[in-house]
């Protein structure tokens, strides 16, 4: 009789893993791989076994993907043996094969480069704490090159396991260069979708990367600071339970009252299908079009109004980057710029069905350095959320219809899911919607494309179609059409502190004499429609787009006033050069 070398449990002799501790049971040494000497011990890294499996006996699946992590770092974080994690990933890959996706593991803590194109064939690496996202991207580039060199099926899905301390989150320079913004960069996993080298960062910052074909559809399972291995096991089991599709029958939607018309508009397709609970018996103070309103429905009431069988959560509320502000908030009383918690992280534990979570809030998808209770997305993923979409930075949207920026990417993502696309495909569809007939991608639009990240397994789908005639079709892997005129030149007319002379006084001497009148008209509109007291714009810019069109951009800010939550509201007003207001965007 054989015994597990790790825990001593008796074995029958045929097991691949110990049923007690999860340790891999080796019955014979693994054969060498392409001239690379085997590890000089009884262990062989999981990525080598899976790569051999793919070349010799690939699963009969039409979809292929990579589970990407750093097992050594993950094992240290969880305080567990790496073999336990290898077993979890192997079981997950086996289970997901029945959903027509063949996942293989790429472990950055024990990886052998095997392609010619990556330039490091036979190099064995173990990425540590000092490794950057570029080092991790190089591993993905090796996978891409190997698949192309050997004619293997393309692994179009990339499922990242771990937070910034496990697989670094790339950051790019921010597109919006306004001093009042406060953010200098954007954290985005989008660079892992294009594993072609460090130049992809500058290509994304110039927005030209959107014209290139992406290789991976990326989703990430971040790991909270307070998590143990049960967090990972729980999510993987949840995802396996819905591998055939996440049932979506009941929607919970809540918004700040200033955005009620827009949110009700976005939710109207699901309202017509009866997916939003009928709240006709609730006063208009609390509800609009079956969408609950923030100031009246607060964290104290969530448990009594959020149904336990909710399977899609759509929130259009404010978020904060202050570490102590864990939940989402709303303005209360209206037009006072005072913000209070409306939707706490604990609310993510109310639904007892597997669910999809979508949030427009600023910093709604923050997770780096946060525990479960301080991160909304991690709180959901620790419970029943299997797919999530949220932003890493300040997000912008329209106060009222038509939709723009965060409203568009979130609403289109949901439509994509509910018309048969996988989560990763729905993310592509949502980003493609920004390249429309007007031929313009603004700095706000570019920010939205990068800052919204997908959470969870990107291969998962919803189990409902809004309209069978609109079932999922094959998508282009280019976010932007190759002939789309991307780019813009910005001339700052005035910016920053006003000094002794007011900004508007100095604007009077600007080349465009009508800017003073335009600014006055904007001030009246903001006060009449949104209660924003008259003030000077902090920034005025003239923007010339690659298609030849020109716009004026006025930026304003309104700090919170004595709020329990730290929320600075930003306004960005775009006009034609003759002063016609085209859009009014506000931060979420």
Predicted region positions:
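Short, non-transmembrane alpha-helical segments in secretory-pathway proteins
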Residues: 499-545
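Cys/His-rich metal-coordination motifs, chiefly Zn-binding "fingers/knuckles"
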Residues: 1-35
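Catalytic-core segments of thiol-dependent peptidases
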Residues: 110, 116, 143-168, 251-370
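Exposed beta-strand-loop-beta-strand "reactive/processing" segments of non-cytosolic proteins
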Residues: 534-576
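Preferential activation on post-signal-peptide N-terminal prodomains/segments
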Residues: 474-516, 561, 585
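Structured catalytic cores of large enzymes
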Residues: 43-102, 110-277
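Active-site-proximal C-terminal subdomain of hydrolase catalytic domains
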Residues: 112, 165, 360-483
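Catalytic cores of nucleophile-dependent amide-cleaving enzymes
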Residues: 165, 186-234, 316, 321-413
